[in-house]
UniProtKB/Swiss-Prot annotation:
It is found in: Cytoplasmic vesicle, Secretory vesicle, Synaptic vesicle membrane; Cytoplasmic vesicle, Secretory vesicle, Acrosome. PANTHER family: SYNAPTIC VESICLE GLYCOPROTEIN 2, SYNAPTIC VESICLE GLYCOPROTEIN 2B. It is a multi-pass membrane protein. Coiled coil: none annotated. Residues 132-148, 204-205, 259-277, 412-535, 587-592, 650-653 are extracellular. The modification Phosphothreonine is found at residue 36. Keywords: Cytoplasmic vesicle, Glycoprotein, Membrane, Neurotransmitter transport, Phosphoprotein, Receptor, Synapse, Transmembrane, Transmembrane helix, Transport. Probably plays a role in the control of regulated secretion in neural and endocrine cells. (Microbial infection) Receptor for C.botulinum neurotoxin type A (BoNT/A, botA); the toxin probably binds via extracellular loop 4. Residues 1-10 have a biased composition (Basic and acidic residues). This is Synaptic vesicle glycoprotein 2B. The gene is Sv2b. Belongs to the major facilitator superfamily. Gene3D superfamilies: E3 ubiquitin-protein ligase SopA, MFS general substrate transporter like domains.
Length: 683
């Protein structure tokens, strides 16, 4: 088996380590053994010397001789690191000059829309499951715990994808890993619309979340490396508009597709493709279109230069220059750059020979090598010279996510709560009624019947909705083709009564006494209650919430390079905290919608500034990795926020409001300890 070799990220191993040791030592030992032949006893021959075992004194002397060589190796390593840092600093300033020469024009705007679609796919993913659930729960007969897991699994997938794919983008390239990310999302999101079982649907949404989770870190790192210092803050903020567009797109598609139950088909009695599945496929379109368009875009030249690929990077920069100059009407302008500084390479992967081991072993070695490189890179972000910036950013990302995602879930839940309270206030109560020989074939809704007596009554082809029969006596009654939602019989006596083709299952009769009563041919299917109302208001709330961030996006884009990143983060988070206190006055649906729009509109500026400063604080070989770590932590904060805030709906508004406000104030003040990056070149 041929030997395979790879050089470590930081080349910290001396040549004398086990993987690089040669046979010279054995040859010396054999020679030493030969020399001792024929010596007399006065030579103090060491026992075992004839077996080639070196004397302890010889070992000590060898170690003494090797110590300087190890020190030289470490010194050379330090010199190499210092030289590389000088090269990177020189490259950063030279690259800034080159990007200025290339100009900002058609190429950047084309890339802007391609990457914007990828960011839009991330925004869509947040809403897909929540919009599809009211219809999907009926098809899959989902309990509350299963619905909660579906909402959770998307964030878990996005968290894992941000960690993994963000790290890979710093090793394999922005374009390659982003294409992989979008392909995973598009394929598994589409597949999830066809699968019938809950487990398969859950798995597909998990993998889809992993795919799209890597898009946001890569998109911002990728686009920033084509922007000059003067344009970076503004245009990265403009890019954030596409995340808002994703929410608008998902809301509009849900509004226009899901209520149309005829938009589907059935194959036999077991396979049903309903309108919510059409909605899931439509939501995969942004990722699909972005993936196809990305094929025509080049790799980041800044990344290629970091990898030592000078010629390829030069060709791409020339393409950027020529594209922009042609669009400006000056095609004769020549790209004057002939040579670009490339950093000293310290990380090299040597391809394994095809004759080395089996295909499985070769791929395993490749995987372990890449994994080690990504892991070391992540540790360098957390424990290296950037650890303090990473810690501060982690706190800011987490507090922002906890409050923002927590409140964006709390708003629609509170609106539902207000709807339920209003509905309950209109409930009709019938006490001691006596009905004899009646035929009832209309809908009974939102009623309570107590201590009544129904004799020889027929309930035919009717619908019970939120109806409670309590301490009621049924005698010689007949129920046929009856459907129900949230309907129960409590402490009732049911005598000589027949139930034919109904969904009044046994769990709907609580402490009831049956006398000579029969159940015939009960309805098949799910035995759970689901609301029949469409979620028009929830779609509208999400639509308005997404649309409300547009003014904040525009303002943050125009002011990002004027007032700086830190003032934008701190100011936006503090203003958002003040807006939280207005929620105490949100005692109706319309008021809650208005305060939601205000909160989303003020907080978006902090998100945009966070994206920009995260990109600018880290060098090229750690940029996507650090962004992925922080974005993964953001999704963890979103999970906690959703769980904590939802648990207080209908109980108290004080805890969610104070928690959100405190998180925003704390995060905004801590963010001021970060360095300002407005005048900084990309390292």
């Amino acid at each position: 088996m041929d030997d395979y070799r790879y050089r470590d990220n930081y080349e910290g191993y001396a040549p004398s380590d086990g993987y690089y040791r040669s046979n010279e030592q054995n040859q010396e030992e054999d020679a030493q053994s030969d020399v001792t032949e024929g010596h007399d006893e006065e030579d103090e021959i060491y026992e075992g010397e004839y077996q080639g075992i070196p004397h302890p004194d010889d070992v000590k002397s060898k170690q003494t001789k090797m110590a300087p060589s190890r020190a030289d190796g470490l010194g050379g390593q330090a010199d190499l690191m210092a030289e590389r840092m000088e090269d990177e600093e020189e490259l950063a300033h030279q690259y800034e000059t080159i990007i200025d020469e290339c100009g900002h024009g058609r190429f950047q705007w084309t890339l802007f829309f391609v990457l914007g679609l990828a960011l839009m796919a991330d925004g869509v993913e947040i809403f897909v499951v929540s919009f599809a659930l009211p219809s999907a729960e009926k098809d899959m007969c989902l309990s509350s715990s299963k619905k909660g897991m579906l909402g959770l699994i998307v964030y878990l997938g996005m968290m894992a994808g941000a960690f993994i794919l963000g790290g890979l983008a710093d090793k394999l390239g922005r374009k390659k890993v982003l294409s992989m990310s979008l392909a995973i999302n598009a394929s598994f999101a589409s597949l999830s619309s066809f699968v019938q079982g809950y487990g398969a649907f859950l798995f597909c949404r998990l993998i889809s979340g992993i795919g799209i989770g890597g898009s946001l870190p890569i998109v911002f790192a990728y686009f920033s490396e084509f922007l000059s210092r003067e344009k970076r803050g503004e245009h990265l903020s403009w890019l954030g508009i596409f995340w808002m567009t994703g929410g608008i797109y998902a809301s509009a598609m849900a509004w226009s597709i899901i209520p149309h139950y005829g938009w589907g088909f059935s194959m036999g009695t077991n396979y049903h493709f309903h309108s919510w599945r059409v909605f899931v496929i439509v939501c995969a379109l942004p990722a699909t279109v972005s993936m196809v368009a990305l094929k025509f875009m080049p790799e980041s030249p800044r990344f290629l230069l970091e990898m030592g690929k000078h010629d390829e990077a030069w060709m791409i920069l020339k393409q950027v220059h020529d594209t922009n100059m042609r669009a400006k009407g000056t095609p004769e302008k020549v790209f004057t750059v002939s040579h670009i500084k490339t950093p000293k390479q310290m990380d090299e992967f040597i391809e394994i020979q095809s004759s080395t081991g089996t295909w499985y072993q070769r791929w395993l070695v490749r995987f372990m090598t890449i994994f080690k490189q990504v892991w070391d890179n992540a540790l360098y972000c957390v424990m290296g010279p950037y650890r303090m910036n990473t810690l501060i950013l982690a706190v800011v990302w987490f507090t922002m996510a906890l409050s923002y995602y927590g409140l964006t879930v709390w708003f629609p839940d509170m609106i539902r709560y207000f709807q339920d309270e209003e509905y309950k206030s209109k409930m009709k109560v019938f006490f001691g009624e006596h009905v004899h020989g009646a035929t009832i074939n209309f809908t009974m809704e939102n009623q309570i019947h107590q201590h009544g007596k129904l004799v020889n009554d027929k309930f035919i082809k009717m619908y019970f909705k939120h109806v409670l029969f309590e301490d009621t006596f049924f005698d010689k009654c007949y129920f046929e083709d009856v459907t129900s939602t949230d309907t129960y019989f409590k402490n009732c006596t049911i005598e000589s009564t027949t139930f034919y083709n109904t969904d009044l299952y046994k769990h709907k009769f609580i402490n009831c006494r049956f006398i000579n009563s029969t159940f015939l041919e009960q309805k098949e299917g799910c035995h759970m209650d689901f609301e029949e109302d469409n979620d028009f208001l929830i779609y509208l709330v999400s639509f308005l919430g997404s649309l409300s961030v547009l003014p904040g996006n525009i303002i943050s884009a125009l002011l990002m390079d004027r007032i700086g990143r830190l003032k934008m983060i701190g100011g936006s988070m503090l203003i958002s905290a003040v807006c939280c206190f207005f929620l105490f006055f949100g005692n109706s649906e319309s008021a809650m919608i208005g305060w939601q729009c205000l909160f989303c509109g003020t907080s978006i500026a902090a998100w945009n500034a966070l994206d920009v400063i995260t990109v600018e604080l880290y060098p090229t070989n750690q940029r996507a990795t650090a962004f992925g770590i922080l974005n993964g932590l953001c999704k963890f904060g979103a999970i906690l926020g959703n769980t904590i805030f939802a648990s207080f709906v209908g109980i108290t508004k004080v805890v969610p409001i104070l928690l959100a406000a405190a998180s925003l104030v704390g995060g905004g003040l801590i963010a001021l300890r970060l360095p300002e990056t407005r005048e900084q070149v990309l390292m």
